[in-house]
Amino acid sequence: IGITSIFSLQETMVLHCCELIKKHYPEKLLLSGGVNARWRADKFLNGGFDIVATSEAEDTIKEIVQVYRKGSRDWSTIPQIKYIKEGKIINNSQQGKVIMNLDELPFPAWDLLPLDRYWKVRRGHGVMFGEEEEVKYASMMTSLGCPFACSYCHIGKEIKGSLPQEIGRFRIKSDERVMEELRYLKNELGVKQVFIEDDSLFGRKKRAIRLLKQVIDLDLRLMDINGINIVHLLKKGKPDLEVIELMAEAGFTDFSFPFESGNDRIIKKWCSSKWDINNTDIEGLIKALKKNNIRM
């Protein structure tokens, strides 16, 4: 059983789930991964998990399953995991493969998910839906990592030589791959709402503009739950109206607005000096987004 823990806020809930599963199904193998889990791996292992992935786990999970199917629990050959052996935490810190070409990743198996149940429950993004609204939605990523390295963010620490390796490096799927995934979601699964989970959708602004232009004809609603960096919505400190209008035309209805701080010193010291508070027309930016019916 695998349980992801991405944010600190999820930690208590995930560890409680682990406790309940171990109580009722002690023979089950419990895995965890994600940002929160990998940086707090020892606590997760002491809390009942058998294995924690300490980097991206697209290949790791397959290797674990291959060993488990043989009836073994010898994880010693699998890189970038921590696990429990005879009551002790073992750290397999040898480096594994960091996937730089995201088109190498297998096509997401959305068809294996009980999507109709997700649509009824409306979680984990249910807070962005109307109270009585049932939306046929799915999540996807067009990129991994981020071009910035802010001190408060895990990405700034996920560099070459770190425990997870350089998975914070900004990497993208090709335009063709992104459009193939979107068309599949709409045409094969009937999805109408897509949550973009990228840490930095506009990390390459020209690429993002190309994608938005292609998405227009799909007639989908788009939301970016992690936010779009303010600097990418600006041109010389003013609202980039071309981009904002294109977002609306492509179907963007909602996204998080990551101001990060209202203090210029904090932005410069801890937030990669991404934008200049004193020379940015934030009020104009907000008005431009609202004018285009984009909720923040």
Short names for language-model regions:
Residues 108-295:
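Radical SAM [4Fe-4S] cluster-binding motif and immediate context
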Residues 1, 24-26, 47-49, 190-194, ...:
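Short, surface-exposed connector motifs at secondary-structure boundaries
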Residues 1-101:
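Glycine-rich beta-alpha loop elements in corrinoid/cobalamin-binding modules
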